[in-house]
């Protein structure tokens, strides 16, 4: 019999909110009787934007901004129907993007 697996990818700009959400998911899955591997930290994406400080000229004067996207991966192996139901009801912060693959 093939093992069922739920793979959850979390993305957020703030790593503290991301870690709290991952901890909530792991705790909920373990409480409902599924085995969990993770949260596994994935590489952080860093987007750098360069902007001219002056409006018209002075191209040598620039300012750089960066956005960091932190990611985590959680695998839930052999989930029960109770696990899926409790994960559907879980309330997570608004700054976290969730991708779920079955």
UniProtKB/Swiss-Prot annotation:
<comment type="subunit">
    <text>Part of the 30S ribosomal subunit.</text>
</comment>
<dbReference type="GO" id="GO:0005840">
    <property type="term" value="C:ribosome"/>
</dbReference>
<keyword id="KW-0687">Ribonucleoprotein</keyword>
<comment type="function">
    <text>Involved in the binding of tRNA to the ribosomes.</text>
</comment>
<dbReference type="GO" id="GO:0000049">
    <property type="term" value="F:tRNA binding"/>
</dbReference>
<dbReference type="GO" id="GO:1990904">
    <property type="term" value="C:ribonucleoprotein complex"/>
</dbReference>
<dbReference type="InterPro" id="IPR036838">
    <property type="entry name" value="Ribosomal_uS10_dom_sf"/>
</dbReference>
<keyword id="KW-0689">Ribosomal protein</keyword>
<dbReference type="GO" id="GO:0003735">
    <property type="term" value="F:structural constituent of ribosome"/>
</dbReference>
<dbReference type="GO" id="GO:0006412">
    <property type="term" value="P:translation"/>
</dbReference>
<comment type="similarity">
    <text>Belongs to the universal ribosomal protein uS10 family.</text>
</comment>
<dbReference type="InterPro" id="IPR018268">
    <property type="entry name" value="Ribosomal_uS10_CS"/>
</dbReference>
<protein>
    <recommendedName>
        <fullName>Small ribosomal subunit protein uS10</fullName>
    </recommendedName>
</protein>
<dbReference type="InterPro" id="IPR001848">
    <property type="entry name" value="Ribosomal_uS10"/>
</dbReference>
<dbReference type="InterPro" id="IPR027486">
    <property type="entry name" value="Ribosomal_uS10_dom"/>
</dbReference>
<dbReference type="Pfam" id="PF00338">
    <property type="entry name" value="Ribosomal_S10"/>
</dbReference>
């Amino acid at each position: 019999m093939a093992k069922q697996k739920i793979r959850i990818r979390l993305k957020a700009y703030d790593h503290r909110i991301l870690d709290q959400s991952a901890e909530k998911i792991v705790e909920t899955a373990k409480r409902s009787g599924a085995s969990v591997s993770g949260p596994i930290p994935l590489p952080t994406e860093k987007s750098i934007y360069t902007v001219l400080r002056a409006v018209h000229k002075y191209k040598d004067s620039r300012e750089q901004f960066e956005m960091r996207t932190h990611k985590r991966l959680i695998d839930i192996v052999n989930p029960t129907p109770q696990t899926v139901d409790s994960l559907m009801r879980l309330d997570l912060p608004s700054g976290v993007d969730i991708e779920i693959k079955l």
